[in-house]
Amino acid sequence: MLSNWKTEPVWRFWGLYVHVCKMETLREAYLMAKKNDGAPGIDGVTFEAIEESGVESFLQQIRDELVSNTYRPMRARKKEIPKDGGTKVRVLSIPSIRDRVVQGALKLILEPIFEADFQPGSYGYRPKRTAHEAVYRVAQAIDQRKTSVIDLDLRAYFDNVQHSLLLEKVARRVQDDDVMRLLKMILKATGKKKGVPQGGVVSPLLSNLYLNEVDRMLEKAIQTTRREPYTHVQYARFADDMVILIDSHPRHDWLARAVEQRLREELAKLKVEINEEKSKIVDLAKGGSFTFLGFEYRRILGRNKKWRPHYAPKLKKRTALLAKLKEIFRQNVSQPVEGVIEQINPILRGWVNYFAVGDSSECFSFVRDWVEKKVRGHLMRARERSGLGWKRWSRQGLYGKLGLYNDYRLRRPWSLPKVQPAASVT
């Protein structure tokens, strides 16, 4: 059927709901939910409780409700997550496991349909695509002298997705009343007429679909301004984080303005607001910088006297990490250091693994020295002998005997990977 869709732009899929309701689909959705783990929803039901009472009976009950059209989603539990250690928070919605399974089943059926329509520059929460690929795509564009950058910030994007417009986009490809009814119920469970809940299983797919026409416009801009083998426009989007990079040669001065204007027109159609205070056009050739996916990008003169992209963790990300670690040390001030290290190691490992693809050596050295200092301070307080713990514990002792995380190696490739040429846009 996907081949039909490719050749027929108006192709609509039908008979999908029966696949959503199949036990094999629900089983796979349950395994996906369990793999991601997460806290229980508003009903307090845990995976342990489900396993104890029987997974098959749990899934069979869901299937019966779906088939009889008696399924109704519960309200999601809300949890506030601090943004980069600051005062602002992001509200995370935590559905019940039951609702995660239903959303997962719906995603399993709908995702292949919409994946066939998504564009090369979109990376967020898509199969076989990673944030690192988006990071590299931007770095390669800078390496290709695309140094005029539209750094775009969308105001509360997930909270402002219009349900009516979103459902229209789904209906262009889905001709199944039961699927549409189920999707409407999931959206209405938020109690609002707009917004997709951050934390919902199907939300990333829907948020990508909502911005797909923006992606399509940008891919068309890449193609229409292409002069083989060169492109003069490039972009990358990961969910609501988006940057557009344009060749800064004086003859292309008009291009940045034209792309920005078209971008505003497409976003206005979707009723997506641009945060004007945080959005800007940056000229990397004049020393400007911008952030994308936690990295701060700029252009520097390399040892070979050639300009190259430089991207490292932005200061807010480092500050947020240290604040999180500091709180763990504070909460465990009287506990053995081994227990503290057991808590901070996974945090360090995850943070370092993400940022190891960039020019992060200076930042990593700072973090490593800071962590060493905190661990030695903890050892001194534990022994109540001022100064003893500091020199007694060499780096070999900290990393060898105590097992403090120590893999701060960079994993950046020797050369920037080739970005696949954009597909033609019809």
Give the location of each predicted region.
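Short secondary-structure subsegments characteristic of cysteine-rich extracellular domains
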Residues: 358-381
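Short, solvent-exposed helix-loop connector elements
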Residues: 91, 122, 194-198, 326-340, ...
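Charged, compositionally biased N-terminal leader segments and the immediate start
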Residues: 1-24
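Core structural elements
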Residues: 21-26, 73-77, 84-85, 187, ...
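A conserved non-catalytic segment of reverse transcriptases
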Residues: 188, 270-336, 347-349
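Extended C-terminal regions of large enzymes
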Residues: 372, 379-426
